[in-house]
Amino acid sequence: MNNIVKYLAAVILLSVSLPVSGQTTQISGVVLEDSQSGALPVIGAGVKIKDTSNGSVTDLDGRFSLSAKEGDVLEVSCLGYRGATVTVGKDNYYKIFLEPESMMLDQLVVVGYGSMKKSDLATSITSVNTDDMKIFPAATAAEMLRGRAAGVTVTSASGRPGSTPSIKIRGTRSISASNNPLYIIDGSVASDTEFAMINSDDIESIEILKDAASQAIYGARASDGVILVTTKRGKAGESTVSYNGYVGFQTLHKNFDYYTADEYLSLRREAVANDMGIIDATTVPIATALADDVMAQVYKSGEYVDWENLMFKKAALYHSHEVSVKGGSDKLKAMASVGYFNQDGIMKVNSGYDRISSRVNLDYQVKKWLKLGANTSFGFSKREIENGAFYQFITRSPLSQIYDENGDYIPYINSNKDTNPAYSALHDSHDAKANSYRINAFADIAPFKGFTYRFNVSYYNRVNEEGHSRDSYYPNGGGSTASLLNTTNVQTLIENSIRYDVPIKNENHKLNITAVQSVDKSLRKTLGYSVSNLPVDKTYNYIANGEVTGQQRAYSENNLVSFMVRAQYNLMDKYLFNLAVRRDGSSRFGTDNKWGTFPSVAFAWRASEEGFLKDVSWMNNLKLRASYGIVGNQNGIDNYATLGVAKPMPGEFGDTYYMGYLPGNDLPNQNLKWEQSGTANFGLDFGILDNRIFGTVEYYNTRTTNLLVSRALNASLGYSSMLDNLGETRTHGIDFNATFDIIRSEDLNWSVTTNISQFSGKIIKIDDTVDENGNYVSQPGNNWIIGAPINIYYDYKADGVYQYSDFDVYSDRGSLTYKLKNTVDTDGDGVADAPLSRNDNVELGSVKLRDVNGDGKINEDDRVVYQKDPDATFSLSTNLRWKGFDFFMDWYAVAGGYILNPLMYDGEYGGDLRGRSNGMKVDYWTPYNPSNTAPRPKYGSEVPYMRTLAYQDASYLRLRTIQLGYTLPKKVTSKLKIQNLRFYMTATNLLTFTKVLSYSPEITGNLYPETQQTVFGVNFSF
């Protein structure tokens, strides 16, 4: 499939045929791969007459044809092969051989402020296969990255349309500051929302900077990795129009059983019986069990509400359309694109997403020494928000009355006036809109060979508008209400950079110097109002006509000034050195700590170029790398953390409304300084057996110090907390990726790619406080435990549910008494003489806790760590191509980590049915069903520690993607006057194997389920 994609790309970029002067004739030929595998066709190779725009590309059989005259020089090139030149003679047919590059070692890789050959890299930079990435039909590029690069973890917090997943590069290393990567799009710093808005077909390449040596050139913002995105640009030649679109539908990939009327009645009978001491729950009267006239009437009617069927659609539509135009001349080149994406929510309440995004990239060669360029992007999105409707649905009883006699929803489902979520959704409107644009302009000045100065300026503006309104019919609403919040984010970047390839006569030495100076200013403005008694229901457009009940205003800005210099030295194409240092000054820190210095060093040895390996036929590439660097972190903290900031306090005096101010909650800290991470990275790049097997294995170890942590203060100071530099963490792990080209032939190609990441981390210290033994002290209240991972739950460990076997039974005058068995040896004689001590009443069917430290009692010392982040991730994908057919399959797995499953409990004491107020069917304990999964239900009393049963191993294995495509042969498309035409079908999230009892093994917050998707698409160009 990679060959097909290269062919399609080359067609778009190189298929031009302009007239040339002189006597011309039609020539043809074939381009073949000169390798140990034999003469295989090279698909998508560009064949161009030197110094002209006249060219062609090879088809699926490696063949080409074009007009040329005798004496013309044909330049033949293809990604992954050494170029070749052939002089046109009297012959009309030419057979041209290209020699493969080892692992595509001449492929240019974006490294930040420039690019270089992959073979010359000394740092850890992963190039994402964007062709495979785009196969997954997702709303955002972030979701497409899942499983595409070792060391990169993508997690979905919600399945809601338009939601943006989080990305972590090599795990969590900061306690309070941000752990999100830095995004660079076409050289400009961008946000995750801007990355999410990119049309997938606009992406030319994505590089991920994973070690500190590659990240250090971005200094202050690069501690959590860098994602470099380069978008496509125009090429000289005929204009090419491309379209890629698909239409598909979504369905729930998992369904759960919810209680029927009889099952729910049995549940409530058990709950009442347990509270009232009734042995036989079936004797509890229906009226007593249901305790609600409406519920009793619904039960007698023989009907009940299937909430899952009520809240979910059978299928939800979504579609995507992207159109681009590329072309230009030797002077002016342009690329323009526009895309539209629409996704309907799987829930029947408001939850859709619309996005329009466009891009224009221009390059103008004014003079030989002067080039001007511009990158512009525009985007609009609208997201409908269902306001937690899923949670409301699942916490409602199946014995609910939801319709009136006309079949319309009613506001309350029972006599207790519990609201009807279906009715509430009709009278509640909540949406978020975003408008954004970026204008980036640059000038490249090259006064002499090897030297380029670039002046770059970028302006980004994003306006978010979030509106929420409830009409006068909303249950318990007290009249119509509305709120409107406008947030404006503006970023301005001015950058000067110099890149100089130092001329050295001795070809064994190559030296490149890069220097950068930049000024980055960001500001954020917020304005919001809340009103009541609107003249028009269910709209916030008339918010000015309501009675103001609240307002919000904020303004914040920060500035970053940076200087960077980097030297890259290549000795004999064997020994590679990379030195860099960046100095950043941030307005977020105090006068004495504004500046941070971030150096790095890297070395690589291309062992395969040494004489003792040069003649080893099966060894095509072997490179060893080592690097160390320091990067900074200022993300996730307030712009004014070092200053005393007042907070608004509105008040009234008589009939006059005043806005007053009080001291803020945080004590200002002038000594606040940069959080720093130092990373050592060791890597090995390999390619063997004619590069049929190639990949990378890396080990990294990171130490993060001066953690930006908010610590609690004594209330007598007048402040509740202060941001400070405290503590230290360490993380380490292994990244591995490999590709296996199993079959290479003219008609059949098959390759398999795998990515494996292993990660672990721990907190070394929080502050300098030590106990009597000199050990650093944990802070359990903040879930900061010395020696434990950073991102955790800290809670008791459930051992199931207490069973009959855990008790001794005594009979007193016909009454049975259950006493917990002796399991604790208090006097050390080897005989258990006391039961396990707990601070609550233990009974049959209650939650059983583990005595972790074995001291015979349950207390805070028995709490354990549940790590949220996975221990490892794994992906396996395969590409198979036979003639015009292509097949892709992708598996993804997560090992380790826990989630607190919100479907397994509804809080410790929430709802009238204690501990089990949602309608999802579970196997709860009864005297006749001694389950170990869920405790015995309660009605009016508490079910302590129920949440401990909701910690579940979040490991899963998922068949993530299958795609089948067919590309029409050239002889057909030529008759249709188009360059290429491909049809495809893609299915996602087909199978998931996990122990998590939820709609998704990842989602713990907003309970909007993920979906299974099937799409049918087409792409073509002409």
Q: Can you describe what each PLM-predicted range is?
A:
Residues 586, 841-844, 894-983, 987:
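Extracytoplasmic gating/loop element in the C-terminal half of outer-membrane beta-barrel translocons
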Residues 402-403, 471-481, 652-662, 713-722, ...:
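Solvent-exposed loop segments that connect transmembrane elements
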Residues 242-299, 724, 743-865:
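Conserved small-residue
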Residues 1-359, 364-366, 371-373, 438, ...:
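Short, small/polar-rich motifs associated with maturation and membrane association
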